[in-house]
Amino acid sequence: MLTFDITNDFIVGDRITKETLNKYSKLPHKIKAGLFLLCVEGSVQASINLAKYTINKYDFVTLVPSNFIQFHEISDDARFYFAGFSSEFMTNINFIKSTMSFLPVITEHPIMPLEESVAQLYIDGYRLLIRAQSLSPSYSMVNKNLVIAYLTIFMQGTAELYKNHSHWTNGIRTRTNEIYRKFIQLVVEHYTTEHSVSFYAAQLNLSLPH
């Protein structure tokens, strides 16, 4: 299985382009890192967790660990700002537990269209982080407490964006959504001792094919 992760705790930049995305266009990739992307130019057609989307200018994309993504049609002028956090770093800070309340909503709706004024605020934030990173000798030298602060900013900002879409966060919950919520809760409670698929399937009253 093809996967995507990053070696440093944190990366940030403004130059994800068509050339970059084409590397992930032939086959789906499993995301191991946490990624926050903002489209600032062009458009992209992509599949995220098997659902097809069109990503346009000022769309904010949240990809969490275990998401799958494949890019299809990519405009020549496509460009994204991005921030990424490694799988190792996110595991160490217990990412699943800290995002459990809205992780299912992000998984079902990974793309959030932003108003231009809000998008500009995010662009300013990315630029500030890019500037801060340029002052460090290398990415590997970034203080872990700072990285935790960066991730907290992105997660809190993302949570607020989704709270403003009540038809997503407060709508009728599908069975799939409910199963996913319960699964996340079980993982948080038992992940240190239980690693068997059959255990979680039994707790959810599901047969293994599910």
Predicted regions and their residues:
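Generic protein-terminus/edge-of-domain signal
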Residues: M1-N56
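Amphipathic, well-ordered alpha-helical segments in soluble domains
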Residues: L35, L121-R131, Y150, F154-G157
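A hydrophobic/aromatic-rich effector-binding and dimerization subdomain
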Residues: L2-I6, I74-P137
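Conserved metal-binding segment of the jelly-roll/cupin
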Residues: I55-F68, G84
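Short beta-strand His + acidic residue motifs that chelate non-heme Fe in jelly-roll/DSBH
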Residues: Q45-S47, I69-I74
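Key DNA-contact positions within bacterial/archaeal DNA-binding proteins
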Residues: P209
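Short, Lys/Arg-enriched, Trp-marked, Pro/Gly-tolerant hinge/linker segments that flank
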Residues: P137-L146, Q156-Q185, E189-F199, Q203-L204
